[in-house]
């Protein structure tokens, strides 16, 4: 039975992978970098495959540093950055880079929608403010 918890945080510039014991003590951690793409002014995108690759590069080293066998992992928690959506094909393959929280290409659309629907109503419906 597993006795350790694995945390994976997909951040803006890197993923962080960490293993904790049941008392919350850090056993080992590591970081895997990836890039932000800026193809046009106001655009900020990332390739979800880069996220996956960074986790796959980082995880083995964290487990090795912690001296914990993967079968001893009881659970995995994953945190992602804001509300980025990933477009996948019918086989689960990434179709394109995804806009991330600092992408502002939808600014005009957000202004129009916010003018028609109260900001508090939008928040009540989806749990997030409408912003580019």
Where is each model-derived feature located?
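Active-site neighborhood for divalent-cation/phosphate handling
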Residues: 118, 123-132
